[in-house]
Regions:
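"…together with the soluble PPM/PP2C metallo-phosphatase catalytic core" -> "…together
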Residues: 1-138
Length: 138
């Protein structure tokens, strides 16, 4: 989690604007943006880690989230984020094929802490990068 903190603060990608959640206008986080972002990223990582115990659930959820974000990024002209989502999506497919016994074997595998944490971090990172205005455009 220390590495996540360093990457979030070092990259300066933060949840600065939560949008119009309650109909009162945009909610700007100001100085609370980096702590809120850190809590949100760690929460997303732990959420994906918790669902890894069910066969194929973490991989399926990750695949759906990454394909959706990739398509939306591509449509919005964000090619780097779209390709990142596509590459991670393609890497999840063989894992799912083996995990759901499509390969013909009865073996079950889990992502483990390393896999679920990386996927949770990538999904959270893409969600933040795609939901916040780019620097200099807002």
């Amino acid at each position: 989690m220390v590495a996540v903190s360093i990457m979030v603060v070092g990259a300066e990608i933060a949840l600065t604007n939560l949008g119009d959640l309650f109909g009162w206008g945009n909610i700007q986080l100001g100085w609370f943006a980096f702590p809120f972002t850190l809590i949100a990223v760690i929460g997303a990582i732990n959420a994906l880690n918790m669902v890894d115990g069910v066969d194929g659930l973490a991989g399926s959820l990750s695949l759906i989230a990454l394909i959706s974000m990739g398509l939306l990024a591509w449509q919005g002209g964000r090619a780097l984020e779209a390709w990142t989502a596509l590459l991670f999506s393609v890497s999840i497919i063989p894992y799912l094929l083996c995990n759901l016994s499509v390969c013909g074997r009865k073996r079950r595998i889990f992502l483990g802490d390393g896999g679920s944490m990386v996927l949770g971090f990538v999904i959270a990172w893409l969600a933040i990068a795609l939901s916040q205005p780019e620097v200099g455009t807002a």
